[in-house]
């Protein structure tokens, strides 16, 4: 029954006017939730209540979606275009969803908002003047540490919005709030939030690389940096307002992600730079649009595994490993075509050790004074 149901869902005629980042409250997102035995009626009730509040004609400060969208758009225009999502531990992955929504919707025409998810939280002095923090606080979670960190950010003058969630079902309300807010922010930035003009580029490059592989029997070999050279390259390109995007083509593991957190922490501490992280090829449909179409402030560190052991793809003349490397190379070439600085490092036999080697070599940067700005007041969810 489950197999039949899944097949029927897959065969559904999805509405072509719904962006992939807006599917969470459609059948695409709700059916998996139902299979997990979540209360769908309760989810939709929370989302519907938020929709009513966002659709009513009222002052911006009383409209949850318009308020967040106006804050994101106005602060981005003022130079605070790095929206850093903080969330209670049980809902920490919300930031990954918001990452795709914001990056895919706003990153175009050399404008956009850079979403930051699951970055280690540090002292306020470590952050530059390009940050805007949004804190999703879940009632009943262990929030003591995060509460203190957020309060420190507010005292230091960083703009912070806090949304209070009664329980996890309030995430449905947040989904609608953020979708509405993203459209508002896109309007303020003067871009069309419902298209993805640069997503296809990397796909086309990947196909060209694979065609070359099937003809020549090998993939092109881009210039590869050692961990030491990677750090030199990164350090030489970091400027005020930059962000470092770490793009990893490797098997996801907890140990590897812990190493990535150490690297992100080192970069923020030493260079006061924003960091993002994504696994390839997943990020191509998340932050990939922003990387190529958004502001030219990104510095890209591409980490590529040896892809062993490997598996052959049925009915194809290449393996999954070759496909992944072709996707990495295709995106690298697309980034370079847009004038983006890209540094590639081969992870080698021990990906964790390679990432740690980069983190240990991150150079300190001269300290600079932190600029204080006006605070953004707390906005509850209900």
Language-model regions: role of each:
Residues 283-317:
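Conserved, well-ordered active-site substructure
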Residues 1-14, 18:
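Single conserved hydrophobic/aromatic residue that forms the stacking wall/gate
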Residues 15, 114-116, 132-136, 161-164, ...:
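Hydrophobic/aromatic beta-strand patches that form the interior of the parallel beta-sheet core
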Residues 139-154, 162-164:
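Phosphate/diphosphate-binding loops
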Residues 15-132, 142, 170-274, 285:
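Active-site phosphate/pyrophosphate-binding segments
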Residues 124-140, 297-306:
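Short, well-ordered secondary-structure micro-motifs within conserved domains or adaptor modules
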Residues 165, 317-331:
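Low-complexity, glycine/alanine/valine/leucine- and proline-rich hydrophobic stretches
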Residues 195, 200, 241-243, 279, ...:
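C-terminal amphipathic alpha-helical interaction region
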